[in-house]
Curated annotation (Swiss-Prot):
The active site is at H114 (proton acceptor). Gene3D superfamilies: 1.10.520.10, Peroxidase, domain 2. GO terms for molecular function: catalase activity; heme binding; metal ion binding. The lineage of its organism: Bacteria, Bacillati, Actinomycetota, Actinomycetes, Mycobacteriales. Binds 1 heme b (iron(II)-protoporphyrin IX) group per dimer. It comes from Mycolicibacterium smegmatis (Mycobacterium smegmatis). This is Catalase-peroxidase. GO terms for biological process: cellular response to hydrogen peroxide; hydrogen peroxide catabolic process. Bifunctional enzyme with both catalase and broad-spectrum peroxidase activity. May play a role in the intracellular survival of mycobacteria. Keywords: Heme, Hydrogen peroxide, Iron, Metal-binding, Oxidoreductase, Peroxidase. Its EC number is 1.11.1.21.
Length: 740
């Protein structure tokens, strides 16, 4: 800070100076925030690539010992003792945040639900798997108001069990224990979620810059932007008052179906979660919501991480304000029963207002008067419902489902148990990752189950490699097929990958990105090799091994003898074990590694490349190495030559980087205006190469150019091959959770 500017004259941290002079900062304001307050190059160039999402959860910010392994540590947990401690917390009301009805169970259910409920199936991001509810923005979402208190109530438990229990596991396990303590039988629980130590900044939560804004995520009639799932910024699912606060139950049902569907739930699962969840507890709106203080991230230091301080009355208990709605659904709010549906269908309902002015519903003609207990004082009142609750009654599909449960509560219990388990575990990956004594024996289609594979001897691997090498399949076919299979992996929810051999099944066999006609030929050839070999090898292993053969051939053509690491043991799933609708979300709409950009992309191709690399769990150097290598291996979608900057395609050379950075080439946009570029000889004007935005970004973006320069250097040829093989193997093995 300049010495002639008194510190008291500076704007507060987090605020920008608004009186920017003409011709000032190109970002539109006159004073950039310091780095410690969030200032960055993005303030100057807001449209630049965010390379930091390729540096997720680095070791340098992890306070645990370098050799600490949570998945081993959690297996030392005394789960019975943990359960008892959570139960004790639930039954011990604290004056600083008194328990509704003397039981924190409903609060813990909401905490677990809102942690897991951020998951969206389109990109696999969100969910409870990393304990993100502790960090911004989720810890400060309006829909998560008061969940800061739930986590603070559990701090003594976390403190006691230390590193053997992650916050990610504790947050959702507390909700599971709460259900069971109130009489519900869950389907079980799996431990194994590892905490991270910084917010996930690779998740796009929406375009809005104000809480509860809903003006920018919809187009047309009510088309919600992908990959978003919630209807408003800062909500988990839908607006409980109805769309945009309009108390229309039928319109609410439309939002519910869309939102829960984007979170991987069908109609039965959706109805079960709403009915089951709203069997317990209450909402809080007994006062003027506009008087509530700022959320945790904006609260003053003395609040020590808590937010939403309420100055009205005691500020807690009967005076608590969370959503502004004041609803208790049933007369048994801490007990599992069928009373939610009995009350929903046992009354006609009329619109009313909460003390905070929110739209909610009460029984007509004073129905069920004095039947529902007050949470913090003697006396009783009537039940209430949300607009989103009445949606279950007015929507014909939801009504058919829930009316049956009214007469068959055992079916509701079964469906809620399954849906709740799915909610908590959807982002954990396959059942082989489930840990602990409460893992259920049952499995479900949504878990993408894969039969166990077989081990292979060194001799068997050698024979298979020889058969593949002599099969007539080209380096391009071998490498591209393995890449198509393995690169479906998503580190976000641990779905996809080569394991399972689903590249030969629908829907993957028919995806445009996979070039179905050519892929079908390669699949047939692999099936012939599989049969002719006489070896009990899975199709999945064969595809990866074939990719390795292609890489080894390409390295040899570049003058290097390498052996690409191969770990057998992949299994083959069947079509019956594959949920076609669910797997459709894994279809790549863009794959910059193969210069593929599908129709209707919402972002430029280079941004899609970074996003895909992030989902694959790649670092920026790994991404750079793979793009450069795959270009010279000639694996582009459709056989295009964009970015194939070599006269030796099929050889694993550094030619992509050398020729991209060669200043004798001048680049200009193609007159076809199709997002491609033409590289011409500066001296003669003769065309030399063509490229895409993904190709040119490695020369244009300063960070990527720095990486490209490393591999273009004369002494990097061997290093490039070594680094490519390492990055390739990482992708091939990304879904091998059975391999250390």
């Amino acid at each position: 800070m300049p010495e002639d500017r008194p510190i008291e004259d500076s704007p507060p941290i987090g605020e920008a100076q608004t009186d920017a002079p003409a011709g000032g900062c190109p970002a539109g304001f006159g004073r950039i925030k310091p780095p410690v307050a969030g200032g960055s190059n993005x303030d100057w160039w807001p449209n630049q690539l965010n390379m930091k999402i390729l540096q997720k959860n680095p070791d340098v910010i992890n306070p645990l010992d370098e050799d600490f392994d949570y998945r081993s540590a959690v297996q030392n947990l005394d789960v019975d003792a943990l359960r008892a401690d959570i139960v004790e917390v639930m039954h011990t009301s604290q004056d600083w945040w008194p328990a509704d009805f003397g039981h924190y169970g409903p609060l813990f259910i909401r905490m677990a639900w809102h942690a897991a409920g951020t998951y969206r199936v389109s990109d696999g991001r969100g969910g409870a798997g990393a304990g993100m509810q502790r960090f911004a923005p989720l810890n400060s979402w309006p829909d998560n108001a008061s969940l800061d208190k739930a986590r603070r109530l559990l701090w003594p438990v976390k403190k006691k069990y230390g590193k053997n229990l992650s916050w990610a596991d504790l947050i959702v396990y507390a909700g599971n224990v709460a259900l069971e303590d109130m009489g519900f039988r869950t389907a079980g629980f799996a431990f194994g979620r590892e905490d991270r130590w910084e917010p996930e900044e690779d998740v796009y939560w929406g375009p809005e810059q104000e809480w509860l804004d809903r003006t920018k995520r919809y187009t047309g009639e009510r088309d919600l932007e992908n990959p978003l799932a919630a209807v408003q910024m800062g909500l988990i699912y839908v607006n409980p008052e109805g769309p945009n606060g309009n108390p229309d139950p039928q319109a609410s049902a439309i939002d519910i179906r869309e939102t829960f569907g984007r979170m991987a739930m069908n109609d039965v699962e959706t109805a079960a979660l709403i009915v089951g969840g709203h069997t317990f507890g209450k909402t809080h709106g007994n006062g003027d919501a506009s008087l509530v203080g700022p959320e945790p991230e904006a609260a003053p230091l003395e609040e020590v991480g808590l937010g939403w301080r309420n100055p009205q009355g005691t500020g807690v208990g009967k005076d608590a304000i969370t959503s502004g709605l004041e609803v208790t659904w049933t007369h048994t709010p801490t007990k599992w029963d069928n009373s939610f549906l009995e009350i929903l269908y046992g009354n006609e309902w009329e619109l009313t207002k909460s003390p905070a002015g929110a739209n909610q519903w009460k029984p007509k003609d004073n129905g069920w008067a004095n039947s529902v207990p007050l949470a913090h004082e003697d006396g009783k009142t009537h039940p209430s419902m949300l607009t989103s609750d009445l949606a279950l009654r007015v929507d014909p599909i939801y009504e058919q489902i829930t009316r049956r449960w009214l007469d068959h509560p055992e079916e509701l219990a079964e469906e809620f148990a399954k849906a709740w388990f799915k909610l908590l575990h959807r982002d954990m990956g396959p059942v082989t990752r489930y840990l602990g004594p409460e893992v259920p024996k049952d499995t479900w289609l949504w878990q993408d189950n894969i039969p166990a594979g077989n081990d292979l001897s060194d001799d068997e691997v050698a024979k298979l490699k020889e058969l593949i090498a002599d099969s007539g399949l080209t380096v391009s076919q071998l490498v591209s097929t393995a890449w198509k299979a393995a690169s479906t992996f998503r580190s976000s929810d641990l779905r996809g990958g080569a394991n399972g051999g689903r590249i030969r099944l629908q829907p993957q066999l028919g995806w445009e990105a996979n070039e179905p006609d050519e892929l079908a030929q390669v699949v047939r050839k692999y099936e012939e090799i599989q049969k002719a070999s006489g070896i009990n090898v899975s199709f999945a292993d064969l595809v990866v091994l074939g990719g390795n053969v292609g890489v080894e051939k390409a390295a040899k053509a570049a003058g290097f003898d390498v052996t690409v690491p191969f770990t057998p043991g992949r299994g083959d799933a069947t079509q019956e074990e594959t949920d076609v609708d669910s797997f459709a979300y894994l279809e790549p709409k863009a794959d910059g590694f193969r210069n593929y950009l599908g129709k209707g992309s919402d972002l430029p191709a280079e941004f899609k490349l970074i996003d895909r690399a992030n989902l694959l769990g790649l670092s920026a150097p790994e991404m750079t190495t793979l793009v450069g290598g795959l270009r010279v291996l000639d694996v582009n979608h459709g056989g295009t030559k964009h970015g194939v900057l070599t006269d030796k395609p099929g050889a694993l050379t550094t030619d992509f980087f050398v020729n991209l950075l060669d200043m004798s080439t001048a680049w200009k946009p193609s007159p076809a205006d199709d997002g491609t570029y033409i590289g011409t000889d500066r001296a003669t004007g003769s065309p030399k190469w063509t490229g895409t935005r993904v190709d040119l970004v490695f020369a244009s973006n300063s960070q990527l150019r720095a990486l490209a320069e490393v591999y273009a250097e004369d002494d990097s040829k061997e290093k490039f091959v070594k680094d490519f093989v390492a990055a390739w193997t990482k992708v091939m093995d990304a879904d091998r959770f059975d391999v250390a």
